[in-house]
Amino acid sequence: MQIVEENLRDNEGEIKLIPETLDDLWHLRFIIEKGDVVFATTKRASQSSDKLRSDKEMVTVRLGIEVEKVEFHRFANRLRVSGKIVAGIEESGYHTLNITVGKELSIIKKWKPEQLERLRRAVEDSNRPEIVMLTIEEGYAVAGVLRQWGVEEIFEERMGYGKGMGDSRKEFFGEVAAKLESFDFKYLIVAGPGFAKNDFLDFLKERYPEMAKNAVVVDVSSVGSRGFIEILKRRVVDKIVGEVRLAEEAEYIDRLLEGIAKGERVAYGLDEVREAHNYRAIEVLLVADEFLLEEREKWDVDGLLREVEESGGKVVIMSTEFEPGKRLMSLGGIAALLRFNVKG
């Protein structure tokens, strides 16, 4: 994320920025909210100067809209911001701004501390090296790229049969390596059960030495999404780029589920969390980003977050694009790890 210009007073005002990655669009999904004013260039139909014709030509204009709806279309690589036109060549009607990577926009609003922190983090993360995780076992591999919101699967490969086992295995390794080579990344984590991961790295060292130079091997029990989670838990990512957030989220959910199973020092669901906060018992408050968006329209959920921090608790906003955040949503979207039990 690139901040072009910032004009704030008491956390209120305009920030002009340019999203540089798909991750930046995802961040904006949780920064832009109903009632904000967003400016960006867009295409609008303009009535032809030829009065005898009814056709219209498309012209590029800069419009400002008061936001009513925000949608993140990950697979279309865009953010759709819809609302009432409040500034531009016409100041009536409704329009949808399509925000894409590289497109400048301005956001005018009362900025919440969590939103400014998310923006600052996006700016810092724009220089983070990209990491690819490859989970591999005999005859099967799944690769994913580490995003700011989690791990996005990019391909899977299965070994074909029909040749000798040795030839087929080398061909399989070659196909996996060729697919990896088509992606731009700096670090590679090769993980999985058994010996396939080590043999694959040896293959890379021989055939793709540049790729192998920044590769590490990790032992995990699963291939695919479960394997990705195991990698994060082992803090391999931390050792490479010091990225702790995703690994921490996975650990927090493990602690939460363990506490639920034992009935010790946890609260989940809004009612239990509020009760725990009344006792000032919250050590870590876990909040799903989707829960935050939904509840902000109903009550002052940000007030609860501030109070928890003021009483010495830590607030962690978790992405529902990733498995730990999805699990949290299934538990009500909000939970807490407690300093002490509050139930009898």
Curated annotation (Swiss-Prot):
Assigned keywords, A-Z: Cytoplasm, Endonuclease, Hydrolase, Metal-binding, Nuclease
Subcellular location: Cytoplasm
Gene Ontology MF, one: endonuclease activity
Principal location listed in the UniProt entry: cytoplasm
GO cellular component annotations of the record: cytoplasm
Enzyme class: hydrolase
InterPro entries: eFR1_2_sf (IPR042226), eRF1_1_Pelota (IPR005140), eRF1_2 (IPR005141), eRF1_3 (IPR005142), Pelota/DOM34_N (IPR038069), Pelota_arc (IPR023521), Ribosomal_eL30-like_sf (IPR029064), Transl-rel_pelota (IPR004405)
GO biological processes: nonfunctional rRNA decay; nuclear-transcribed mRNA catabolic process, no-go decay; nuclear-transcribed mRNA catabolic process, non-stop decay; ribosome disassembly; RNA surveillance
Cofactors (names): a divalent metal cation
E.C. no: 3.1.-.-
Complex and partners: Monomer.
Summary of the function given for this chain in its UniProt record: May function in recognizing stalled ribosomes, interact with stem-loop structures in stalled mRNA molecules, and effect endonucleolytic cleavage of the mRNA. May play a role in the release non-functional ribosomes and degradation of damaged mRNAs. Has endoribonuclease activity.
Entry's free-text remark on domains: The N-terminal domain has the RNA-binding Sm fold. It harbors the endoribonuclease activity.
Similarity comment text for this entry: Belongs to the eukaryotic release factor 1 family. Pelota subfamily.
Annotated protein name in UniProt: Protein pelota homolog
Species this chain originates from: Archaeoglobus fulgidus (strain ATCC 49558 / DSM 4304 / JCM 9628 / NBRC 100126 / VC-16)
